[in-house]
Structure formats: C-alpha cells, structure tokens
Amino acid sequence: MENQHLKNHVKAIADDMHNGIEVQVCEHCSTHEEPNPEDTSCPCCGEEMVIEMMDGWQYLQDALDINYLVSSDLKVMQGARILVAFGGPNIWVDTTKGLVEGYWGGDSATASFHEDPMGVEMAASDLYWAARS
C-alpha cells in the first residue's frame, strides 16, 4: 500500500539532502532561522541576517539517532544512517546508499539523493572519529 503523505515527506527530505537547506544567519550572534524574506532582522540582537546554506553540523543537531557503517578493522567510516523523524513516520537518511527511507505502519517509501552540499556525511564522520578518540 502506498501512503502519499509518506512518499511526499521522504521526497522532500531527499530534495533537501540533494539541494541543501537555506537558513538565515546572524553574523553578529550566530542565531540561525528558516529564511523569512519579510523579516531579515535577528530576533536576538536586531542585526541584519544573511541567507546561507545549512552545514552538516547544523543538520545533525536535530538528528534523533545516528548509526555508523564502518569497516571491520574500524579504520574506515563508510557512511551513516541518520534518523530524522520518529513515531509516525520513521525516516532515515542513508549516506552510504544516497537514499532516504521512510516507514509508517505497513507502508514504506524511498527517494534518492546524489549530492551532499551541506556536508552531512562529513559531519557524521567527524562525530564518529571524535567519539572514537
């Protein structure tokens, strides 16, 4: 059975992974928000905010879980499986496969991405190596 809501949600996340996510950033106090063309002033300090692409570290801040795929000798982190939604639907971003996988009840949906402009996989790799050291 196909769940259109699940399919749309998975596709939107795959598009975000492929294209990157824009955020408004205050260069004065480092506040980050979703872009709002009607209000570009920082809610914290009032300075003008600029639009930038979210980086991998910012993306992983909202991750619910990260599973790492590593070589048997533990010397190569080959990719990560990142839980980005849980409880209905459950959605994973798999950087090894370039795939977003969603599950909701008995339904499932997948969508692929071929680019990682935010550097999510590199940020996950940095987290893995930091935890191992």
Segments predicted by a language model, with ranges:
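N-terminal capping/linker segments that flank leucine-rich repeat
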Residues: 5-8
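Long, charge-rich alpha-helical interaction segments
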Residues: 13, 17-20
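Short cysteine-rich clusters marking metal-coordination/redox-active sites
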Residues: 24-29, 42-45
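Cys/His-rich microdomains that often coordinate metals
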Residues: 30-35, 46-51
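Short cysteine/histidine-rich metal-coordination sites, predominantly Zn2+-binding motifs
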Residues: 41-48, 56-63
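Amphipathic, interaction-prone secondary-structure segments
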Residues: 61-97
